[in-house]
């Protein structure tokens, strides 16, 4: 707190607290009163024995909450009061808006230095979503559709909320007698009608109230009743140059304000001077290609239009996002070969995922965007070195690549998923795409696609396996050669592993694999493999079956499977092999058309399932009649 403010005693939440005299806060008196009430509530929560955490994206709202928690903790430390360990979490999804990601990384560096300098017992935790929930694996690898407007935002839960809760749970387990966890969040009622309704449904409409969440810890919307203008006013109150009464982990939030201004076509600003026009900026930042926002991502478009010299390199990302939107209802990009097998021996025929062609197209686009960004950065750095560009702050930020969406780790995850999917012709299919773009110089620019109008999605149908045998007859992840050679190559470990067959329920030997709590790929191992993927590797891959690369990853321990999930991946491999064999046997007939033509309706399938329930009952009745 700025020393020029004379403390006074006020009562907040039934107890007395020394705070800056509001009269001496001048034009900030109103926001100081609001902030001090929040700080007092946080202090009270700490006094009650709770462990505190702030979940921040470094957007305007979560930054306010972070600063309030930091201020409460700083005062306790300076006063010599007991202060248990606290945490700040930041979710790094790998799909963030590059401008916001660059800003967040800079803020984390400043925050960690601030906590160290002041001796605050705060740990900054950077979390990532589980491998199987990432856009790279789930959408590019497995074909899961992105979350579009009108659907529940499962991406926010999978990519941000769940990883943060998991990380905090692990950290709390290392502490001696930790208190129950309270996470301070920046949700506000005035953000939107939908947000307000959701907050009321969860019981978060009262600022400072502790609300038990589904993870067994508490959420606290400490600024639930703040208006957007108050959010900006508080951030401005943290700057000495504006005469603000607070000091925090950065000297000013000008960078933050500038981002929001640019995301609102360069016209949005807040002026805190006397008589100034206080038009606060309320733009929102989503992921780089957030599809929840509807037909357009107005924030990113505005950033590119208002400051092309700073954000023009994100134009390709916006085109990628629009491509996802424009092809949403294109059923020709869907995979009509399902993944659910019924008790009657049928597999579902439903277009709820992208087909192999669409997944390959999307990967090509992102790989190309990554390469183009590297080329932009190299040219930018060269011009800086030659003195052709001024060494401004914005030019310094643009040095080096500002994004890489397809990292080696992501590439291996996609390659592993494709190796277990129908529609890919040879081993290491994703790595081959990488090689052709990175080494052979291919480029795939995103064309404008006429949006497909929303239509009626065909209902789910069912195709019977029996006519073409069954995936149960396929080899899947079995490999006699690896089983034989592993005994000599790796005598210290089992030559193979045993699982419970998903189709027949019997024990079954498959390739050796390692397990972890969830699917795991070591980034360093991934980088080494990608670097070694040369012309000979590329050529060899063309002569191997897709499943061979999956078995390679598992046998080498490059991909570790989630505990107890190996049988699922074996079943995936066998289904893919079954469809590949069926396609060969059809000798040119389109597989998807054949399956749909020879499938039955959902109603017919339900009748078959019902008859299966009746038959055992009739048999039992007949047996009982024999002994009547």
Residue ranges of predicted features:
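Nucleotide-activated chemistry modules centered on ATP-dependent adenylation/adenylyltransferase
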Residues: 2-55, 60-628
């Amino acid at each position: 707190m700025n020393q020029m403010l004379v403390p006074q005693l006020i009562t907040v939440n039934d107890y007395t607290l020394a705070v800056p005299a509001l009269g001496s806060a001048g034009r900030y008196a109103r926001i100081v009163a609001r902030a001090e009430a929040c700080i007092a509530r946080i202090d009270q929560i700490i006094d009650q024995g709770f462990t505190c955490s702030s979940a921040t994206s470094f957007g305007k709202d979560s930054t306010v909450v972070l600063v309030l928690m930091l201020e409460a903790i700083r005062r306790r430390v300076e006063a010599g009061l007991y202060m248990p360990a606290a945490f700040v979490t930041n979710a790094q999804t790998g799909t963030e808006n590059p401008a916001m990601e660059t800003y967040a990384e800079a803020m984390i560096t400043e925050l960690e230095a601030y906590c160290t300098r002041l001796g605050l017992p705060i740990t900054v935790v950077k979390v990532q979503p589980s491998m199987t929930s990432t856009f790279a694996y789930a959408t590019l690898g497995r074909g899961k559709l992105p979350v579009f407007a009108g659907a529940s935002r499962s991406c926010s839960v999978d990519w941000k909320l769940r990883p943060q809760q998991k990380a905090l749970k692990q950290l709390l387990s290392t502490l001696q007698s930790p208190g129950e966890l309270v996470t301070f969040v920046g949700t506000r009622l005035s953000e939107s009608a939908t947000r307000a309704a959701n907050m009321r449904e969860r019981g978060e409409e009262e600022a400072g109230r502790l609300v038990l969440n589904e993870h067994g810890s508490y959420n606290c919307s400490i600024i639930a009743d703040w208006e957007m203008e108050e959010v900006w006013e508080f951030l401005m109150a943290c700057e000495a140059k504006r005469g603000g009464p607070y000091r925090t982990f950065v000297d000013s939030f000008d960078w933050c304000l500038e981002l929001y201004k640019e995301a609102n076509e360069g016209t949005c600003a807040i002026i805190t001077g006397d008589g100034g026009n206080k038009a606060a900026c309320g733009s929102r930042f989503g992921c780089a290609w957030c599809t929840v926002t509807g037909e357009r991502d107005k924030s990113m478009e505005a950033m590119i239009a208002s400051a092309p010299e700073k954000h023009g390199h994100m134009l390709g990302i916006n085109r990628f996002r629009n491509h996802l939107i424009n092809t949403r209802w294109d059923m020709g990009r869907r995979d009509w070969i399902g993944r659910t097998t019924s008790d009657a021996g049928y597999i579902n025929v439903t277009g709820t995922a992208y087909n192999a062609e669409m997944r390959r197209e999307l990967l090509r686009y992102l790989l190309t965007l990554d390469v183009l960004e590297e080329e932009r950065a190299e040219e930018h750095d060269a011009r800086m070195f030659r003195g052709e560009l001024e060494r401004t702050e914005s030019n310094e930020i643009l040095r080096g690549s500002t994004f890489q969406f397809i990292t080696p780790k992501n590439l291996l995850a996609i390659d592993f998923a494709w190796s277990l999917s129908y529609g890919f012709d040879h081993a290491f299919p994703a790595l081959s795409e990488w090689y052709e773009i990175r080494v052979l110089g291919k480029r795939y620019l995103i064309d404008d696609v006429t949006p497909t109008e929303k239509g009626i999605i065909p209902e789910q149908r069912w195709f019977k396996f029996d006519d073409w045998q069954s995936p149960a007859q396929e080899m899947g992840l079995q490999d006699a050669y690896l089983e034989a050679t592993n005994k000599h190559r790796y005598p210290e470990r089992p030559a193979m592993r045993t699982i419970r067959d998903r189709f027949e329920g019997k024990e079954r030997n498959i390739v050796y694999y390692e397990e972890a709590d969830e699917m795991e790929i070591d980034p360093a191992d991934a980088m080494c493999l990608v670097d070694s993927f040369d012309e000979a590797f590329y050529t060899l891959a063309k002569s191997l079956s897709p499943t061979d690369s999956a078995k390679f990853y598992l046998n080498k321990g490059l991909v570790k499977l989630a505990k107890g999930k190996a049988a699922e991946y074996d079943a995936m491999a066998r289904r893919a092999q079954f469809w590949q064999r069926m396609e060969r046997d059809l000798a040119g007939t389109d597989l998807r058309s054949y399956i749909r033509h020879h499938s039955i309706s959902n109603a017919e399938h339900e009748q078959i399932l019902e008859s299966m329930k009746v038959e055992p009952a009739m048999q039992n009745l007949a047996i009982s009649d024999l002994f009547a």
